[in-house]
Amino acid sequence: MQTSPLLESLMEALRCLPGVGPKSAQRMAFQLLQRNRSGGMRLAQALTRAMSEIGHCSDCRTFTEQDVCAICSNPRRQQNGQICVVESPADIHAIEQTGQFAGRYFVLMGHLSPLDGIGPDDIGLGRLEERLQVESISEVILATNPTVEGDATANYIAELCAQHGVMASRIAHGVPVGGELEMVDGTTLSHSLAGRQPFRF
């Protein structure tokens, strides 16, 4: 079936989104054109502005329109002395939703992966080391993902922290709240046993 070149172009563009295949892209394109053209225009405008105006914070590397993001420029956060290292800006959002962290962040935009040619410079560790040297940092909390690459990245950063006399800690991994032990995989259960805590009354 021969379709409009513009329609084909729209469907192809939509396929750049994660989890969107040919059928999903087709449904989205038809939905926008048939029922929600105003929504499509808003989407196009928002995408154009975001792609041209959103960059990276010069301190933590998260997404922002400013040179320094709102979290990094917050005086209370600066006085806190803690930096939480995460793999992506989405991780910041997840941690902020807990309301349990009052420090600043550093976003790696990935993790170390020598097999893929991703080394320390590719994930901004030079900038992190600069911050360790010049800022008054009391603790670096390593919140990389509990994967082989995430653990290797955390270990590398912990060594960097040790070289600069800064305490490094790793977020706990283990059995999820409300989970049943028989449903938990062996690796997670091993982490839970190794990282057990004394009972507090």
Curated annotation (Swiss-Prot):
Keywords: DNA damage, DNA recombination, DNA repair, Metal-binding, Zinc, Zinc-finger. A zinc finger (C4-type) spans 57-72. Transmembrane segments: none annotated. Residues 81-176 form the Toprim domain. The keyword Zinc applies. One of its GO terms (biological process) is DNA repair. Pfam families: RecR_C, RecR_HhH, RecR_ZnF, Toprim_4. InterPro entries: DNA_Rcmb_RecR, Rcmb_RecR, Rcmb_RecR_Znf, TOPRIM_dom, TOPRIM_RecR. One of its GO terms (molecular function) is zinc ion binding. This is Recombination protein RecR. The gene is recR.
